[in-house]
Every structure is written in structure tokens, then in C-alpha cells.
UniProtKB/Swiss-Prot annotation:
Outcome of gene disruption: Not required for aerobic growth on ethanolamine (EA) supplemented with cobalamin (vitamin B12). A quadruple eutP-eutQ-eutT-eutD deletion is also not required for growth in the above conditions. A non-polar deletion mutant grows on EA from pH 5.5 to pH 8.0, but does not grow at pH 8.5, releases slightly increased amounts of acetaldehyde on EA plus vitamin B12. No visible phenotype when grown on EA and tetrathionate under anoxic conditions.
Reactions mediated catalytically: acetate + ATP = acetyl phosphate + ADP
Native organism taxonomy: Bacteria, Pseudomonadati, Pseudomonadota, Gammaproteobacteria, Enterobacterales
Compartment annotation: Bacterial microcompartment
Name of the protein described by the UniProt record: Probable acetate kinase EutP
Organism: Salmonella typhimurium (strain LT2 / SGSC1412 / ATCC 700720)
Amino acid sequence: MKRIAFVGAVGAGKTTLFNALRGNYSLARKTQAVEFNDHGDIDTPGEYFSHPRWYHALITTLQDVDTLIYVHAANDKESRLPAGLLDVGTRKRHIAVISKTDMPDADVAATRQLLCEIGFREPIFELNGHDPQSVRQLVDYLAALSEQEEEAGEKTYHS
């Protein structure tokens, strides 16, 4: 079964998205430790990005995942992506999500440009984790990838 890890800075919206992909749109609490859902997907604490001493824990956590979803808030002007993180595991799929697009100070265009500059390619998803319609775009994309992999004979992501 394919596994997904959600990574990003403190307050980026990882846990909100992690929960929303399973239909839970309630207010997320701060993630204090690595959390797994019933499919083995991983929600990582933002502190793993904020403090270099935790990078080893982040890299170790990501070893067994197939897809890395990087969540970056639309009102965050800086990249906090640890150097080399996109190079961990050569076969990993990298997906970028611009979160908090509904915030008054959101700058989606600048955030998209920043994500492209640090190595992400389209599609880059723009969403509000509390809006089922915007989350649906990502769910549909993951389901389509799962179908493609299934047709190719690979194990599938759980939708």
C-alpha cells in the first residue's frame, strides 16, 4: 500500500490537510509527534522543519513513504524546506500544496513561484483545508495516480 507523508513548517496546515483528506474538517490541534492514520500515512510535526537538529528524524521518517506532500502556507514568504529533502529517496513523488489560500494576507502567485524555485513542478495545489471542494482536487489527483499505478501493476494508494 502506498504511503504519504505530510511535511511543512509549523502552522502550515499539514494536520488540517491530513485530516481533511479523510473527511474530517474539524479544527486541528498542534501535532507534537509523528502521527499515523489507519492507512499508514504520516503527519509530521512542523518542528522537524524549524530546527536542524530534527532533520535526521524527518529524513528517517520519510524513508518508507512513496509520496511527499509539502504544505506551504500562502501567507508565508520564506522557504523552510531543509536543503536536500527533495533528494531523499529517488523514487518518491513530490507534491506541493499551497494552503491557507483564504487568508487575507495570502499571496498565492508569489508562493507558487517560490515553490517552483525550490524544485516543485506542476501540478501545485491551492487549497483551504476547511473547504471540501478545494481538498477534493487533491483527493481526485491522488486517486488518478492510484489508478495509473494499479494499471501498471503497482500497489495502490488508498482513496
